[in-house]
From Swiss-Prot:
It is found in: Nucleus. Keywords: DNA-binding, Metal-binding, Nucleus, Receptor, Transcription, Transcription regulation, Zinc, Zinc-finger. The keyword Metal-binding applies. SUPFAM superfamilies: Glucocorticoid receptor-like (DNA-binding domain) (SSF57716), Nuclear receptor ligand-binding domain (SSF48508). Belongs to the nuclear hormone receptor family. Signal peptide: none annotated. A zinc finger (NR C4-type) spans 11-31, 47-66. It comes from Caenorhabditis elegans. This is Nuclear hormone receptor family member nhr-133. GO terms for molecular function: DNA-binding transcription factor activity; sequence-specific DNA binding; zinc ion binding. Disulfide bonds: none annotated.
Amino acid sequence: MPPALYLSGPCEICEQPAHGNHFGVLSCRACAAFFRRAALQNAKYQDRVCRKGNCIGNDLYRCKICRLKKCCEVGMNSSKFQNDRDLISSSLRPTNYTKTSAPQSLANFLGRPEFILCCEPDKASSTKRLVDVTSLVDKAWAIFQEDAAYSWSPNHYPNSLEKLTFEMEEIKLKESSKKLEIATTIGRNEALLFLEQSFLGAAQWFARLPEFSMLDPQIKIDILKTSWMIWARLDKLAATADFHRQKLLGNDVYMWTDNTCMNPGNVKIDIKWSSNYSVEQLRGFLVPDIEKYWRHALSDLVELDPTNVELNFMLIQLCLNSAGQKYQGHVLEATEKILQIQSDNMHEYYTKKLKLVNYSGRLARLMKINRAIEADVRDRKEKNHIAKVFDLFFVEYSHPEMFEFS
């Protein structure tokens, strides 16, 4: 690299200290700026004549006409003007390509979201394979009919929330003797097992809520079909938090079914039974955003260590809000009534049993966990919609409303 060029001396136009070479001449900034303005095409001083004929040569206060003439005499050249140097104004000025199209990304170019960029349209399947889940719905009906005949004595429990909690504790106590297994592969059998255990587990939970048992049978099924997945999400996160608190599971291991856990980063996924695409092509669709939705909620559950009464209240809030938002009408009316009753029960539990007068801060943190789970389910709903539009899977269910989360 050549050494830096240092220029010094008087301005060749006004003889004031120069600041550098401007338009081919050693000049000050003032004369350079003057020439830049005056020498433009159609400038008002370009063709005028000095009134005096010519200003005194050594007069520092030349008229503008003579000053421009002096600039030209010493060698200033308008061909050395540089235009479009202003980055801000240049960026705001529309160009030919921005007028016709938006900036192209790979997702825009292919017309597919980023997490399915590798999908090939020729692998989309218009022929669907039906998975019949009618037997699960029939089993849920049977659970609701069986528990509807069960008599509840208010003398045994302070309120319906604590009744629900007590009965669910008894069920989990019976199942606690089962050996915990680690899932290394998730394929057709594992996916259907998760569906069966989660759907029927939610049905058993709902059946033990007295206010729910009084609802119309069709409303019960509608609520269950809408909320079983969101129920399973919180139920399994709460179970995972219990194991993490006891140091029985690693930080990256989560509960999958009632007695099965998995590490999402190590588990092998088999989707040959449901899609023509490979796991690598659909990994962004299949693997949940654990850092965004699961890990923070799990950390809060471990720290807060909610009681079983609090946990069941969180489940009620999640499930009934989800069902009410989707169905509106009679379903919304029924869910709002139950939510109001359970809110009163929760207030009574905090103030009378736990002796907490100011519990709003703790309850707000519990509801924050619920909002994170709701966001996760909304994200899954959007992905399911995209999967349907692009025919990513060739499997359909006999009751598709079970997989249309609110």
